[in-house]
Amino acid sequence: MANSAQARKRARQAAKANSHNSALRSKFRTAIKAVRKAIDAGDKAKAAEIFLASSKTIDIIADKKIVHKNKAARHKSRLAAAIKGLQAPAAQ
């Protein structure tokens, strides 16, 4: 257990940061799930609209280094590709 004042303070700060970061990670996952849900429904317009809002959220969380920037870019790229591919099977 933390015995010095500075160790107690660091423990408090770590708990606070952990709580904040957990909330942001949850927001990241929720943003991705919202786009996935729209893609699964097959609504390209709605999926694109939600993707724009989610992209902003994903970028903000990556800028704060809650998730790595490459992970954020990978998710955005895969979501964009999935949205782009929604109309492709119907055209064939």
UniProtKB/Swiss-Prot annotation:
Pfam families: Ribosomal_S20p
Protein name (record): Small ribosomal subunit protein bS20
Function of the protein: Binds directly to 16S ribosomal RNA.
Molecular function GO terms recorded: small ribosomal subunit rRNA binding; structural constituent of ribosome
Keyword terms of this UniProt record: Ribonucleoprotein, Ribosomal protein, RNA-binding, rRNA-binding
UniProt-annotated stretches for the region Disordered: 1-24
Domain of life: Bacteria
Species for this entry: Paraburkholderia xenovorans (strain LB400)
InterPro entries on file: Ribosomal_bS20, Ribosomal_bS20_sf
GO CC terms: cytosol; small ribosomal subunit
The family this protein is said to belong to: Belongs to the bacterial ribosomal protein bS20 family.
GO process terms (BP): translation
